[in-house]
Amino acid sequence: MLDFLAITLSGKPPQVIQGETVNLKWQWLGEGILTLVPHRSYTQSVVISAGIHGNETAPIEILNQLVTDLLAGQLTLAVRLLVLLGNPPAIRKGKRYLSNDINRMFGGRYQHYTPSDETRRASTLEQRVMAFFQASHTSERLHYDLHTAIRGSYHPRFGLLPYQQTPYSAAMFRWLRDIELDALVMHTSAGGTFAHFSSERCQAASCTLELGKALPFGENQLSQFSAITQGLRSLVSDSALPARKTENMKYYRVVKSLLRQHPDFKLRGAEDTVNFTRFAQGTLLTEQPNDNYRVEHPYEWILFPNPHVALGLRAGMMLVKMCESELPIT
């Protein structure tokens, strides 16, 4: 039986690149790229990606087990499915990326970088996702991009909705609620993420899922992600999810991107600040020549603080809380 992760890590294509089981047909489309189509009728086309950052191993392990169970017949496929391991060379080396962050390159932004394996990979991933959705005759398009965060978080499991000018899918929102996410963050401007690309270019209901902290293979406690794992299994098999057991999600929207625009950029407490740390109005957060930032709202929460990014890139995002009723959902 095809071992999706092992073959991808080997750097060699499988000897057999397509086949079928009792329940589905599968096809290897390239390194870390696999389609699975059920024999039965279906109404959804779903993309699940992991490993855009090579050191984020928990989502890779979760996705690989999902593929293994589908191919073994332990889980019955009910959707048209594309699974992607985003950056195989970085996965092999246990690195976030080798030259540049792929998750800033989508939407054609890779063309502004020095050509590399990662710019070419971003282009390939875009082409495969567009071709997958364009060949679909289904009414529903979904994309979940699985990640883990660099540092700890007051909300260990959270989602990021890409900015879009149309309302978000109510069905996606219900699924995100039922997989026990602690928080949901709404972007308020366009970006170079994979989820933003599939939302903007392919009109997919898309979300980036952050599952805990980045750890090496074999060191993940996957039990803490059991609700999300079950959610993915439920999604691809079209089975019901149990009702949410934990307290309700918290909701945030982005109000400020903190850009590192000078070599002397400083970010307050950056080395030990965890995601969703709260700061009061007036707190000085960043310093750089001619551009300091103080918290403007009564309270703001920081996400993805990283003062070591390259010049011109985002060193963090500031959030404010919002109510569920403020989310644009249809």
UniProtKB/Swiss-Prot annotation:
The active site is at 210. Its EC number is 3.5.1.96. Zn(2+) binds at residues 53, 56, 147. It comes from the Bacteria. It catalyses: N-succinyl-L-glutamate + H2O = L-glutamate + succinate. One of its GO terms (molecular function) is zinc ion binding. Binds 1 zinc ion per subunit. InterPro entries: AspA/AstE_fam, AstE_AspA_cat, Aste_AspA_hybrid_dom, SuccinylGlu_desuccinylase. The keyword Lyase does not apply. Belongs to the AspA/AstE family. Succinylglutamate desuccinylase subfamily. This is Succinylglutamate desuccinylase.
